Each structure stands twice: as structure tokens, then as C-alpha cells.
């Protein structure tokens, strides 16, 4: 149960006043970083700006309080933008809330079932493919607001989106582009000046002031979304229906997988920064509770945010108190300063997300991976990338996982091999080789199996053949780590053929897992326990004695 115990309860022992001050200061700084990102990501996801803050406040609190990392900062992230936009377009806000709650439940179940370590089995090529796909989709999604295009709602499909931009390209607002360019310049250059204050906050303050005081014709959050609510999020139970749950189970599962991958990756990165070890299963439960309550209080899916978590560590945060302080600070901003957020130019938020999208993708690494990775990995990478861009994230991950599994099984099947031993007197055996070989009679055939024997490789067993002189077949299995039911069926077929030909089967060096499967299948009873020997020397001695005994009986 200690694995499920929240990290907060562990780190409070010996907690000092000095660390409390550091955590509070770090939490305030991280809240300032999270503010523009939460608003921008919510808008990019197709929901209202305040829902981004609701998510950072509610989900962030539960992730910090119940999670398995000391310094994790939870909230909305760019990874969810694509899937959230698709859900909102198809099912509306209530559908998104249902999917978020379902994803939270799935994450809690994963944590309770100790699935934290299983996330590592998601191939790197899949996570890379959909991450770069998300980056492209997020980047393209900001073109309307960055250029100030006068058009209706942006289509959710990638090709339709590009078509809509092309059709409305003549409506570009030069003033909007200029303000967006100013924001971009600040975002790019500010980190070189100082990392104490986030460039996104400076860009928002500067461009908002320019637009407001110069009364420039630029769309702002207020002009697009109206007056923003400064009320604290209220509890809302969405209407569940069997049909809706059935339709949303796949998107919810995708959200859960994404949240699990990103949060545990963030936890691993922060572990390296502070020299700690997170609890993966407790972290999944914290993420699950965060998403459940985020949905119930009007938020969107959330996970551990790597950039915000790293900022927390760099500013002295070392316990979940920093994450909780970040939530409290955002709550105060929501109540006191939210009306001012309506003045923020939409092009500035688009610029913030353009930089986020650019930072998500290191294209040099992407093309290097395409050039150097094995062909099967490249297929998975490219397929996941293009499916994310041209279809959606749900399809991309489903196809990516299935494709990766099939290609992995193909690789494993190709490693499985059955090799027949040569006899010392065969013409192609050199004298030097013959000296090292054991001289066995031609009535004994030896086959060595290598690699895992599973359904894709079970046919290799069919290559075990005999001739009229064969009395005994010795099967050496020291290089077989595992077998499955399909392989057992093939072994039973081999045993049946051998019995018809009055050939005895002897097995040498059967490893633990194959032996366990054979016992469970009663295969050992079928063959005879005495025909299973611990090594090849004893197996050959046993086979030669059998042949010799049968020869003596025939002579009599």
C-alpha cells in the first residue's frame, strides 16, 4: 500500500519553515507561468478561456495532493488540444466533461492495479509520432488568430482547415499580424534576458497595453468570448447515457494513456532534477482524481506539465505544497484579475501557442530517427505522425499500437529458428569441425530451437523432420525463453507424428516458463517425464542408450 500513498504524506516529515517559504514562492511563480498557458490551451481546445484556469486550479490541486511526485505541477497541456477539439466538435462541452471523468476513472483503475510500470511498454516511436503530429496540428490551428483572418469557426479536419485558411487569406489583418509579431519577438528573445519571469507573461502585458491604449482593431478574448466570469468553478454532474459512454470510451482511453505517459515522463524528468524517486501508481491515481474533479467542476483533461514542473524545481519547489500554492494563486487571480484577461489580444495567445508547438518538436531529431531507425520503427513513427495530423489522435494511437505490436511479433518470429545438427561424417564437415563434434548415430537426430516460440513462430516446429532410419529425436531448448498455446499445439502435433513413426522424443534443457506451460498442458505426461533431461550431454547419452537397447532387443 505504500506505493499508493501520496508523496505529500511522506515529505511532510521534517518539513521546515525555510522550505515552506521556498515552496510558496515557487508556487506563485509557476502560477504566473501557468496563467497564459492555461487560457491559451483552453481556447485552442475549443472551450472557453476560464475552463483552462478551472483545470489548472482543480486538477492541479488533486494531482499535487494525491500524486506520487514531490514536485509535479498539473494542468492543461498541448498534448490534449487535438483530442479535446475533436470531442468538443462532435459531442459538445458535456461530452468532453463525460470523457474527462471517464479518463480519470481509467487512470485510477490503472493506478490501483499497479499499471504504472506498464506505460513504458508504449513504444518511443508512437509517442514521438503523435507528439510531432500534435505539434503540427497545434501550430496550424493558430493561423486564424495570428493572422486575424475574418472567418467563421475553424474546421477540425486538417485538410479542411488549410482550405478554409486559403479561402479567407485575403482577410488578413496587418495590425493583428504586427501585434502577433511583437509577441513572437518577445517570446523568443526574453529567455535570453532573464528566466525569472516567463516570456509569455511579458508578451501578454506589452501587447495588451499596446492594443488597449492605442485602441487598435485587434480581436481580444473579450471581443470573441464576451465578459469572462470571475466566479470560482461550481460542481456540475453531466448527463451520462449508455450510448454516450459507449461512444466516448475510446477517446477517454486515449486521454488516459496520454495523461499517464506525459505525467510519468514529467515525474521521471523531475526525479533526475531533485534526486528523488516518484511513485508511479500513486501518480496515476492522483492524475485520475485530478481529471475526475476537473470534469465535475467544468474543466478539461489535465496531466503533469513538464515545463511547469521543471520551472517549479528551478525556483526552489521541493514538495507538493508548491503545487498547491500554484492552485491557490491561480484561484486568487481568477477572482480578482480575470476581468482584465478579456483585454488580452487573441493573436498574442496564438503566438504563445506557436512557440509551444515549435518547442514540442525537434525536427532534426525527427528526421534523424527516420533515417537511422529500423524500417519497422520508421513505419510506426510515420504512420502515427500522419494519422495524428490527418485523422485524429485516437486513431493514431490505436493504429500505432497495433502496428507496433504486429511488427514486433514479426521481428520476434524471425528470430525463432530450428537448426538440425550435422553428423560428423557428412561430406561438408571439415576434419577440424568433425573433431569438435560428438559422433552420434544416424538413428538419432538433434534439433536446436532458438528464440521465443509463440503463434507467429509456431510453424518453425514443423521443420523438425525425420527419415526412415530415425529412432530418436532430441530437441534442445536452452535458447527458448518462452512458449505459448500455439507452440504447444505444434509440439503436440509433432509428438503425434513421432508416435505414428515409432520415434521417441527427448527434450534437453527446457527453461522455466516453457516447462511450466508443458506441465499445465500435461505435455510432460504425454511424452514421459524421464524424456526431459537437464542438458544436451545427458540427453544424448540417454538417446544413445535407448538406441543401443533397441538394437540389442532386435538382435535377440
Q: Which residue ranges define each predicted feature?
A:
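Transmembrane helical cores of multi-pass ion-transport proteins
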Residues: 1-425, 490
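Active-site-adjacent beta-strand anchor residues
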Residues: 74, 507-508, 533
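Short secondary-structure boundary/hinge segments and terminal tails
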Residues: 289, 330, 516, 535-536
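The feature marks cytosolic C-terminal regulatory regions of anion transporters and related permeases
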Residues: 359-526, 544-552
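Short acidic-hydrophobic, aromatic-tinged amphipathic segments that line or gate anion-handling sites
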Residues: 526-542
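Intrinsically disordered, low-complexity cytosolic terminal tails
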Residues: 554-556
